[in-house]
Amino acid sequence: MHALRLVDDWPVATVAAAFVAPDGSVSTTGPTDHRFRLASIAKMLVGWSVLIGRDEGIVSLDDAAGPAGCTLRHLLAHASGLPFEGDVPVAPPGSRRIYSNTGIELAAQHLADAAGMQFDDYLRDGILEPLGMTATTLDGSPAHAVHSTLDDVLRFVRELRSPRLVDPATAAEFSTVQFASLGGIVPGLGRFDDCPWGLGTEIRGTKQPHWTGTRNSPATFGHFGGAGTLLWVDPVIDVACVALTDRPFDEWSSDALRLWPALADAVIAECGA
């Protein structure tokens, strides 16, 4: 776990990190049972929940949802035209990649309405309890207000690497680019002419610079959060990495965008990938 020693020098009070090697072995550092705010990593849980609902037959990704002309797929892929916050569109659906907390919240509400239950109950019944994520709670907006531990996030990572809650074809769609070739902004990184996104998860593509490493494949998917957190899975080399901290990203963004890729490259090198 030499790569994980890099987090010892991060300018944060508390950090817990891990990586999963191609053989499934897990290396960790830091307090694995400490609860952190995941921030936007929560969006991945919304996307996975919707896909469970799709497999159950209660929703379709092509359901009308959100602004006129918008579908559930648009909402999850940040292609709805909604702004970061607010319910008044600033662009037509499918025309730009506009990162939107509101879009994710509307996707979660659409699923909840279809299921006839609150979204936090659906999340608990659909993901948290089946995966044994007993320390994870939704404490507000499903777009960013989930608290969890490294142990629990690793349980979700195992599901992403080897799905059992959704059909394999459904799982593949999660990390497949939706509405290809849309330009847009990744908050904290900048604007990209090609800004690929899946269904609640960012896809690395050819973005440069990026918060993942130079050794990560373009197929790498995941999310980083404003709470100073990150999760990525590289399906090409079958390596995953998680790092949770207690320092907001905005307070150390320049350092984070140097240190996070360095960690990713070190993890991949240690895995021999």
Where are these regions (language model features)?
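Active-site helix/loop module of the DD-peptidase/beta-lactamase fold
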Residues: R37-I41, L45, G53-P89, I98-Y99, ...
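Catalytic loop of the DD-peptidase/beta-lactamase superfamily, centered on the K-T-G motif
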Residues: M1-T29, D33-R37, S95-R96, A112-M117, ...
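Well-ordered alpha-helical segments within folded domains of soluble proteins
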Residues: L45-G47, T102-Q109, D151-R155
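Hydrophobic alpha-helical segments
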Residues: F19, A42-V46, V50-L51, F156
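A generic beta-sheet turn/junction motif
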Residues: I52-R54, P235-V236
